[in-house]
Swiss-Prot record:
Substrate binds at L141, V142, S143, G144, G145, D174, G187, N289. Residues 192-201 have a biased composition (Basic and acidic residues). Belongs to the KAE1 / TsaD family. One of its GO terms (molecular function) is iron ion binding. This is tRNA N6-adenosine threonylcarbamoyltransferase. It is found in: Cytoplasm.
Length: 365
């Protein structure tokens, strides 16, 4: 008889406090029974970025509320659960610790198994939650603190093909927004301005395209935009609305072109493994960018691979992905004890050397 599992997931690695309940009967599609997210944008907006101490306090205040709301919306109680899963890293350590302590409390009080989940694995496994794709698949994980190409072979088996050696794309979008006086988060703000701009007016560099590997770099792109902004301000005394839109359009075009070309290279390496049904998936907050999605769809179509991306609400940080990743670990027999520790850094591919740089979620795992 097929086993049905119901998992509570907790997420608190950056500036979103989240809880969710996911249920799956073996061999069938998983179902998100509830997904609650309490954001902190209003707490950090005055500082131009996430303040770790403020984030940690907010997580501690909101986690219990999120858990109760998630259970209520799912129509379940703690006795209906099979396990509790929690992000144990990588991330801002204060927030990760808040989530781990909350999950430990639930596990200790109820006797439920505790499952520690790598936040990046949560993103990487989201396409299996939403589209039931089979292993192995090529994953582009592109977010505020991370950017890497992975081949997913199993819930805990990932091979990294390459990644960013400095800023992640999400950081570059955020910094671009700050340079141009746009609101945070920067991704939606820059994308919105870019729709009104001319991407050909300003030609920004496409970093590392002269190298044949799958590594990326975005810090030089940010610097080039800052210099162009300063030049315009020096010449005209300020930026017009059209200047700002054209700068955003040129910046976004450079990011899109870079990701498209590096994806072609990663796809070639992935196809060398001769997967029966080649699939390319993209996840993470920056995956919500429509221009990036469209470019990746074109690259996949050219190579005869299926392209998939989760719904926008599951691209950004959420606990449904943590619950599902925990569910996959639970099915494979994984369990963690009450000695589970929070980890600020936690690479998915333990066999690869650490990436350079350190984003808002820690090292470029």
């Amino acid at each position: 008889m097929a086993q049905t599992l119901t998992i509570l997931g907790l997420e608190s690695s950056c500036d979103d406090t989240a809880a969710a309940v996911v249920r799956q009967t073996e061999g069938q599609a998983a179902e998100i029974l509830s997904s609650v997210v309490h954001g902190q944008a209003d707490l950090h907006s005055a500082y131009g970025g996430v303040v770790p101490e403020i984030a940690a306090r907010a997580h501690a205040e909101k986690l219990d509320i999120c858990v109760r709301q998630a259970l209520t919306e799912a129509g379940v109680s703690l006795t209906d659960l099979d396990a509790v899963a929690v992000t144990a890293g990588p991330g801002l350590i204060g927030g990760v610790m808040s989530g781990v302590m909350c999950a430990k409390g639930i596990a200790a009080a109820t006797g439920l198994p505790l499952i520690g989940v790598n936040h990046l694995a949560g993103h990487a496994l989201t396409p299996r939650l939403t589209d039931q794709i089979a292993y192995p698949y090529l994953m582009l994980l592109v977010s505020g603190g991370h950017c890497q190409y992975l081949i997913a072979h199993g819930p805990e088996q990932f091979s990294r093909l390459g990644g960013t050696i400095d800023d992640a794309p999400g950081e570059a979008f955020d910094k671009t927004a700050r340079l141009l006086g746009l609101p945070q988060p920067g991704g939606p703000s820059v994308e919105g301005e870019a729709r009104q701009g001319d991407p050909k007016r300003f030609r920004f560099p496409r970093p590392l395209l002269d190298r044949p590997d799958c590594d990326l770099s975005f810090s030089g792109l940010k610097t080039a935009l800052m210099r162009m902004r300063d030049q315009l301000v020096g010449e005209k005394g300020g930026l017009t609305r059209q200047d700002r839109a054209d700068l955003c359009a040129g910046f976004q075009a450079a990011v899109v072109d870079t990701l498209a070309e590096k994806t072609r290279r990663a796809l070639t390496l992935y196809l060398d493994e001769a997967p029966a049904e080649p699939v390319v998936a993209v996840a993470g907050g920056v995956a919500a960018n429509a221009a990036i999605r469209a470019a990746l769809e074109t690259v996949c179509a050219e190579a005869g691979a299926r392209f998939t991306a989760p719904p926008l609400r599951l691209c950004t940080d959420n606990a449904a992905m943590i619950a599902y990743a925990g569910l996959e670990r639970f099915r494979s027999g994984a369990r963690d004890g009450l000695d589970l520790t929070a980890r600020p850094r936690w690479p998915l591919d333990q066999s690869s050397p650490a990436m350079l740089g350190s984003g808002k979620k820690g090292a470029k795992a």
